[in-house]
């Protein structure tokens, strides 16, 4: 049977809620009604692939089939992979370099800096950060350990492969691009093994404390343009999980539209950067308990 039997462009309220509850349980991300068309298109794609003829049939497959684990991974992949690119938001990059990284390198000279890109997608932010260290000659002064994580298995696999479209690397400085990328067929370019070896990538669900704690402690956590996808309860859990990966003087960087005003018991603002905010852990003795 073919999914072409499904003719409605969007799901009705009952089955849509089943899917959104399922997604929320797995990821902490809440899909609102405005995302109905987007979600429906993804369900249709996977239904056609499996030869299923209704939204209900695919939902049943996701939740009861003995082989559902792999399909759940694929479904989460197609609804969570977001477009990104190298050197995204140049003012933000420059401010991060000048106001955060340079002082940190000076303070940690002769030591190690650990950075976590908490929702790294296909690795663009991770590799951009590595290039910042190379460009500024900081690797003579410190060793860098950088980890990228994402809930999407496909995104993490792509990050490890390090193959990108020309569009994704359009902002990379020519000196960097010429030295560390190799042109491929089909308007794609491959990152050098030398750079790929400097990063590690893991599949991590940010709302699962056992997964985030296993990463260890970091000097900087990058979590930009991610928290907007969580509701308040899930966001609080994610923030506590990030909190546990940070030292007292570590910094969390979020996007400019992601202020943490309602979570001052977890993080307190330190400085506003260009299109970004930097936060430190709230001091002990705040009014809400960390469970």
Model regions: which residues?
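Short, well-ordered alpha-helices that flank and scaffold nucleotide-derived cofactor binding pockets
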Residues: 98, 102, 131-135, 161, ...
């Amino acid at each position: 049977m073919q999914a072409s039997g499904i003719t409605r462009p969007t799901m009705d309220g009952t089955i849509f809620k089943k899917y959104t509850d399922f997604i929320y349980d797995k990821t902490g991300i809440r899909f609102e009604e405005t995302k109905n068309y987007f979600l429906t298109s993804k369900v249709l794609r996977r239904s056609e692939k499996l030869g299923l003829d209704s939204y209900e049939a695919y939902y049943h497959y996701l939740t009861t089939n003995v082989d559902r684990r792999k399909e759940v991974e694929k479904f989460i992949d197609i609804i969570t992979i977001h477009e990104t690119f190298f050197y995204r938001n140049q003012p933000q990059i420059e401010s991060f370099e000048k106001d955060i990284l340079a002082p940190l390198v000076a303070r940690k000279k002769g030591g190690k800096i650990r950075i976590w890109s908490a929702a790294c997608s296909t690795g663009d932010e991770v590799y951009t950060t590595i290039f910042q260290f190379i460009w500024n000659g900081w690797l003579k002064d410190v060793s860098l350990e950088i980890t990228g994580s994402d809930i999407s298995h496909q995104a993490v696999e792509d990050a490890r492969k390090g193959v990108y479209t020309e569009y994704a690397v359009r902002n990379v400085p020519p000196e960097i691009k010429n030295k560390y990328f190799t042109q491929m067929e089909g308007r794609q370019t491959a990152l050098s093994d030398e750079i790929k070896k400097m990063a590690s990538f893991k599949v991590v669900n940010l709302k699962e404390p056992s997964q985030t704690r296993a990463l260890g402690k970091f000097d900087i956590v990058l979590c930009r343009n991610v928290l907007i996808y969580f509701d308040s309860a899930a966001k609080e859990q994610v923030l506590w999980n990030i909190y546990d990966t940070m030292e007292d003087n570590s910094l969390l960087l979020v996007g400019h539209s992601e202020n943490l005003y309602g979570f001052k018991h977890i993080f307190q603002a330190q400085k506003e950067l260009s299109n970004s905010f930097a936060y430190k852990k709230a001091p002990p003795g705040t009014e809400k308990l960390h469970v």
